[in-house]
């Protein structure tokens, strides 16, 4: 591993996936620690000092990156299979353009959802090459949770949102804990 690790590694039957602070993703053999492959993305000049842990699903490992991207890497060789825009960096300054996926993506069936700081919540269809199912403009660094009806997200101000998991429509919003550093659901 080339730099410090800012997120918990993911452990699966294919090995251990580690994401380092310099935006490198490495698959290590669980038995002896040898490197099976490495994937690297360019690092923006400014990003949050936090990282989303990688997540295994099927034949892929999913990793969120600064710049608002969720990337599906093939477990076999680390090749990017698809890339989904969770957020689109925008603004006049470097600080305005920070749009990082810093919470754990959630997976259920063919759906994977992620959220970005200064970005949005987005859900993708893994069986259709990462096609966007829906997105909502809700910024969060706290995280997501998914059940059989709703996707829950705590926004940057501390409001908790329940969104319809199939359409992204708002079902309810609880804002009684604003500005109290509410955790993810």
Residue ranges of predicted features:
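Tandem repeat domain/solenoid detector
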Residues: 23-24, 34, 58, 79
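Extracytoplasmic beta-rich repeat domains
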Residues: 1-12, 35-58, 83-107, 131-147, ...
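Acidic (E/D-rich), amphipathic helical modules within compact regulatory domains
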Residues: 17, 131-135, 142-163
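Short loop/turn segments that connect beta-strands within beta-propeller blades
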Residues: 29-33, 74-78, 125-129, 164-167
């Amino acid at each position: 591993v080339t730099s410090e690790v800012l997120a918990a590694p993911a452990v699966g039957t294919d090995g251990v996936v580690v994401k380092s602070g310099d935006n490198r993703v490495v698959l290590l053999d669980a038995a002896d620690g040898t490197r099976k492959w490495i994937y690297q993305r360019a690092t923006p000049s400014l990003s949050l000092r936090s990282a989303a842990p990688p997540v295994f699903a099927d034949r892929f490992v999913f990793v969120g990156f600064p710049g608002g991207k969720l990337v599906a890497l093939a477990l076999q060789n680390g090749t990017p299979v698809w890339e989904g825009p969770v957020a689109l960096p925008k603004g006049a300054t470097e600080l305005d353009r920070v749009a990082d996926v810093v919470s754990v993506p959630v997976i259920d069936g063919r759906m994977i959802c992620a959220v970005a700081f200064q970005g949005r919540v987005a859900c993708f269809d893994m069986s259709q090459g990462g096609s966007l199912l829906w997105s909502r403009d809700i910024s969060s660094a706290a995280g997501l949770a998914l059940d059989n009806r709703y996707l829950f997200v705590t926004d940057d101000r501390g409001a908790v949102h329940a969104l319809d998991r199939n359409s992204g429509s708002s079902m309810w919003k609880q804002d009684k804990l604003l500005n109290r550093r509410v955790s993810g659901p």
